[in-house]
Amino acid sequence: MTLPRRVLCVITDEHSNPVELARMALQGGAGMVQLRRKTASGQELYEWAIRIQALCSEQQALFIVNDRVDIAMAVHADGVHLGQQDLPASAARALLAPDAIIGVSVSNATEAIKAAEEGASYIGVGHIFPTFSKDKPSEPLGTASIRPIGRAAQLPVIAIGGIGHDNAAEVIRAGASGIAVISAVSDSDDPETATRELVRRIRQ
């Protein structure tokens, strides 16, 4: 399965109804939805995942699950996104369908190369700008990091961290294949319109 160019990945937050957020993001043109809820039970994630997978299928968008390979397998999601402390990409690749999309979060070239060697489909590079989505964020990498890290891995880059309407196009110009956002959509009064505007910015 191939990652679309200039894709917008909307990640569910810790507070919104993930199914409704996914629905509005898809109506706004998101090409990928990632289910992420660190505090949810396996049962909750499974039930949400079934419904979001159906919504994504209707819109011909990709659906990936954060961390939980078992949930991704159970609902036949398009793939998973893994952090540095999660199951290695190679282990996830052995469990999932051969064409599954596997993303790995990285913050430097060493991690990026390792992700590529383990079979990642793309790397999530960040955080690019200051962000409030993490409890104790490190220093932002900046847009200048995108191209070198992507070249080191020879993989598509989805940039994340502090990305919104004002800087989305800049991130794409810096070499990212796409962007991932949380608060830029979830904190909006109109998530559908916020998504549509982000899509317009990264494709202009």
From Swiss-Prot:
Return the broad EC class.
transferase
Pathway it works in: Cofactor biosynthesis; thiamine diphosphate biosynthesis; thiamine phosphate from 4-amino-2-methyl-5-diphosphomethylpyrimidine and 4-methyl-5-(2-phosphoethyl)-thiazole: step 1/1
Q: Could you give a GO molecular-function term held by this entry?
A: thiamine-phosphate diphosphorylase activity
Note on how the cofactor is bound: Binds 1 Mg(2+) ion per subunit.
Give me the residues that bind 4-amino-2-methyl-5-(diphosphooxymethyl)pyrimidine, please.
Q34, L35, R36, R37, K38, N66, S105, K134
Keywords on this record? Answer: Magnesium, Metal-binding, Thiamine biosynthesis, Transferase
Under the heading InterPro entries, the entry gives:
Aldolase_TIM, ThiamineP_synth_sf, ThiamineP_synth_TenI, TMP_synthase
What GO CC annotations are associated with the protein? Answer: cytoplasm
- Entry binding sites for 2-[(2R,5Z)-2-carboxy-4-methylthiazol-5(2H)-ylidene]ethyl phosphate: T131, F132, S133, G162, I182, S183
Q: What cofactor requirement does the entry state?
A: Mg(2+)
Q: What is its EC number?
A: 2.5.1.3
Origin: domain of life = Bacteria
Name the positions where Mg(2+) binds.
D67, D86
Q: Its Gene Ontology biological processes?
A: thiamine biosynthetic process; thiamine diphosphate biosynthetic process
Q: Which reaction does it catalyse?
A: 2-[(2R,5Z)-2-carboxy-4-methylthiazol-5(2H)-ylidene]ethyl phosphate + 4-amino-2-methyl-5-(diphosphooxymethyl)pyrimidine + 2 H(+) = thiamine phosphate + CO2 + diphosphate; 2-(2-carboxy-4-methylthiazol-5-yl)ethyl phosphate + 4-amino-2-methyl-5-(diphosphooxymethyl)pyrimidine + 2 H(+) = thiamine phosphate + CO2 + diphosphate; 4-methyl-5-(2-phosphooxyethyl)-thiazole + 4-amino-2-methyl-5-(diphosphooxymethyl)pyrimidine + H(+) = thiamine phosphate + diphosphate
The family note in this entry says: Belongs to the thiamine-phosphate synthase family.
Task performed by this protein: Condenses 4-methyl-5-(beta-hydroxyethyl)thiazole monophosphate (THZ-P) and 2-methyl-4-amino-5-hydroxymethyl pyrimidine pyrophosphate (HMP-PP) to form thiamine monophosphate (TMP).
What protein am I looking at? Thiamine-phosphate synthase
Task: Give the organism, scientific name.
Answer: Chlorobaculum tepidum (strain ATCC 49652 / DSM 12025 / NBRC 103806 / TLS) (Chlorobium tepidum)
